[in-house]
Amino acid sequence: MYDLVIVGAGPYGLSVAAHAAAHGLNLRIFGRTMESWHAMPSAMYLKSEPWASHLSDPEGAYGLDAYAATRGVRAEHGVPLPVGFFAAYGDWFARQAVPALDERLVTSVAPDGDGGYAVTAEDGETVRARTVALAVGVLPFMEVPGPLRGLPRRHVTHSSHHGELDGFAGRDVTVIGAGQAALETAAILTEQGAEVRILARADRLNWNTVPPALDRGAWRSLRAPHTGLGCGWQNKLYADTPGIFRRLPAATRERIFDSALGPAGAWWLRERFAAVRDVRLGQRVSGATVTADDRLRLDVTGRDGSSGVVETDHVIAATGFVPSLDRADVLAPGLRRELRRVGAGGAPEVGALFESSRPGLFLAGLLTAPSYGPSMRFVFGAGYTAGRLVKGVRQRLRAGSGRGGGVIGRPRTGEERVTAPAS
């Protein structure tokens, strides 16, 4: 039996694994390293600053800057990095700091009837663990507007479904949303020869400003301090005090989660986006049907009640993610129903050390944002999460059977990667 099984091998899962390995826990981590990051279009860039994009290890030895140095690249403030570079950084981090990683996906996490958990991989093998850390990223929580749900994938996709976008050249594509994913997707589609329109409920597009220099004098730094979430005192509170955020009333946390750090494009994207000529704001999709010639007819409604019709070849919904337990299908249905939730929302309530209301089940990443605040929507939150979560695991192990974990050997090398058996 493992002390800890980690489900997910993105920034949060890898960071938790690095801390758990350093503490000698007998652990196993399942997932394909940085899979969703590797699947992004190569023309996309990291929105966050390099110094706010580190994965977490106990010694701080394997930050993004350390990886950049091995590549002869300077990770500089105010200079965006390609998402492919960040994905490769995650791979490197795993080789340096994480013990043997099992690349199979997990299909089920369920109580084992003996106080622990049964974790089942995609090939049917089941392993047992005293504790589990669920770090499944954002993909299970994709949000698509109601009228578009259930339509064929040839007509409607989420922005996260796409790697390269060159297959849309010459086609009419409607992108729904007003955040970074929508604006960058629209810009890339335009660059690659698609006819693109943006359709958004927002009345205006918001753009982040060019970040001020890190060294700008005491007074300017005091007025608007830098944080991993952007400049300003409100962002500093979100970035530095997730533990205090967790103590707020549930309704307050839900409201802040829904409103803080709203949709906005990166400052460096604005010039690229200027090529997108058809931008329709203050409108929402109220209906959608497939036409006789296999296109999509969208009924749109304005804020003033006006209505209109858009015909398009394809819709890409860049409409974010909703951290609802009902979408965490990897958890057994009975286990999902057992977990306490934040207020009236569907997100799980998370304790002081990232433990859910079910002893031994720990959560990381987006699922914890309604408990710990906006930091958990970003890679930046992994630094706060990983060490505390592993502390919680160690406390739970001591409170349980009292059986200690085995000693993890040296961090794995690329040759130690565990893969699924051939079928």
Predicted regions: what is each one?
Residues M1-T33, G78-Q180, E184-S423:
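Flavin (primarily FAD) cofactor-binding/catalytic cores of flavoenzymes
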Residues A39-G72, H226-R246:
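Flavin (FAD/FMN) cofactor-binding and adjacent substrate-gating region
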